[in-house]
């Protein structure tokens, strides 16, 4: 099934990028049918290549082929099912892989407006544009992001608006 825009835009609350999140509705209304054009562009230009704005600089040992999961995620009413969430797999417990995941986390926060990145989670760090006044939470206790970095775009980023 081809991708379709199923996003419901939220209201800006003063963050660098507006956050759009599905809440309390049935999963079928969030089925985008595939990965969004904006997420595909982000993955191609940042994860699989050297980003045009390479600040902070991408590590030279960043793997050319890293495991990535996007749509459908767990097929729930979430950003993966809407085609605008991606998990890029790096092991937080491995020092080298943590360095690579930390670079991607830092790059996403620093360049959030370019791709309309609304949130990033990796290991003990979590950042959302409109959460904690846009500051990184350095002591996130979520626990389920120790083997991957989670990145999500808002509706505008997903649909290249």
Residue ranges and their predicted role:
Residues 2-133, 146-154:
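Secreted/periplasmic proteins that engage bacterial cell-wall peptidoglycan
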Residues 136-143:
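Short proline/glycine-enriched turn/loop segments at secondary-structure junctions
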Residues 156-161:
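Short, charged low-complexity linker/loop segments at the C-terminal edge of domains
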């Amino acid at each position: 099934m081809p991708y379709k825009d199923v996003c419901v835009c939220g209201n800006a609350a003063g963050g660098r990028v507006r956050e759009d999140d599905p809440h309390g509705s049935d999963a079928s209304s969030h089925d985008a049918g595939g990965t969004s054009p904006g997420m595909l562009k982000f993955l191609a230009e940042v994860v699989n290549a050297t980003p045009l704005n390479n600040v902070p600089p991408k590590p030279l040992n960043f793997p050319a082929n890293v495991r990535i999961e996007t749509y459908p995620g767990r097929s729930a009413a979430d950003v993966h099912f809407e085609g605008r969430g991606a998990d890029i797999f790096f092991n937080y417990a491995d020092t080298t892989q943590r360095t690579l995941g930390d670079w991607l986390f830092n790059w996403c926060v620093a360049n959030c407006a370019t791709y309309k990145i609304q949130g990033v989670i990796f290991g003990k760090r979590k950042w959302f544009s409109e959460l904690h006044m846009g500051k990184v939470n350095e002591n996130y206790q979520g626990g389920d992001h120790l083997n991957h970095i989670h990145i999500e775009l808002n509706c505008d980023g997903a649909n290249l608006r």
